[in-house]
Amino acid sequence: MYSTVRTAVLDGISAIPVQVEVDISTGMPVFDMVGNLTSEVREAKERVKTALHSVGIVLPAKRITVNLSPANIKKTGTGFDLPIAVAILTAMGVIDADSIKDCTLAGELNLNGEILPVSGILPIVFDEYNKGIGKFIIPKQNENEGRLVCGAKIFGISHLNDVIAQFDEAAFTCQKTGMAHEVQMDEKYADFCDVNGQKFIKRACEVAAGGMHNILLVGPPGAGKTMIAERMPSILPPLSENERLELSKIYSICGLLDNDSSLRDNRPFRNPHYSVTQAALIGGGTRINPGEISLAHNGVLFLDELAEFKGGLLDLLRAPLEEHCIRLSRAGRNVTYPANFLLFGAMNPCSCGYYPDMQRCRCSEPTLRRYFDKVSQPIIDRI
């Protein structure tokens, strides 16, 4: 008995189609999974077996082989649980194979058969719909996110029993078609008009905002550097529709997209602490997730206390500042994320912060040089 179900794996902000193949044949009762899988995907075997048992499905005492194709692509994430379970049910004859034709599935299972939300639903639905796939079965909590793609037929489910009952009817239905692109205005910008005085600095910020130029403010504590930076997004041009979609994809991958049927319409403002790690700043980790520079895409990346960032960390921004993207490599995977941000740097004029007020500043000339040398010249050139 053979069956196949379509799903997808994320590659940057794009989705690559994956076929979940299941073969149930005579032999020793073994459950094998192959196809270049990470540990979290291999763990799906136990989740699927227990979830099926909890809904009253007894696996046959035969050899069950699950293959995630193509095998040259690393499979990551927990969204393969639902496709694997449905593929097994199809091979067993519980679900009609014709009912899941031209349908993409994604979702995580817990041990009692509930469907849990997964990250990255928006790029999966968007790319699969552009490839001609019109029907999608996804977790109920991700339903509104999937409906952001106009024309896509979304079926949100909360339990494995919903899948079995739906397909027993031998006809796929959805509640309604995809919704038009609405916008999300959940963040209210701090108003740039709140800045009093500072005529020269305000003019410099306006020029920087007009052309998405990087800017560095150097001044003593309490001069208003942070206040000005926080109000920078309010004078940036509005996001275009393509920019909203691209930004929403990034936030969907990170699980930060609000499930309220709307795309992000606000320019992001990211303010990482100077103790941030390399993976958190530029991206990385086991799944190679986007970092702060990608979350600041089409917005402002504010680096306060610029000279206090760990040695070499700022130099990692050289390529993104020029290429407006970041290329990450880990464990044989190469992922590219957008990173077109306005870098807003702020720092004190010296270690104590009061130079050139010689009545308060106690920094020597060598101390001043060492302080400014913490920010490399290539980074200064790009600002």
Residue ranges and their predicted role:
Residues 204-208, 262-268, 278-301, 334:
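Conserved alpha-helical scaffold flanking the Walker A/P-loop in AAA+ ATPase domains
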